[in-house]
Amino acid sequence: MKIGDLVFHWLTEQIGIVLEVRGDIGVHVLWTTQGRSLFGPGHKEWCCEKSIGLLTNYLTTA
C-alpha cells in the first residue's frame, strides 16, 4: 500500500485515499464516502493495514 492508493474498509464499507503509510502505526486514510460509519466524507483516520484493502482488489473479487 502506498500514498494515493484507493482503499476500502471491509467493516464500514467506506472508500478512501491513503495519505500516509507508517509501519509502526498503520495507514492514514482520508475517507471520501460515509458507508456504514458514523463519520462522513472528509474524516481522516489511522487504520490497521489489515482492516483495509486496495479498492481494485475488492472490485475484482466482488
Identify the role of each PLM range.
Residues 2-51:
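Basic/aromatic-rich interaction segments and small domains that mediate binding to polyanionic partners
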Residues 53-62:
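Long, low-complexity intrinsically disordered regions
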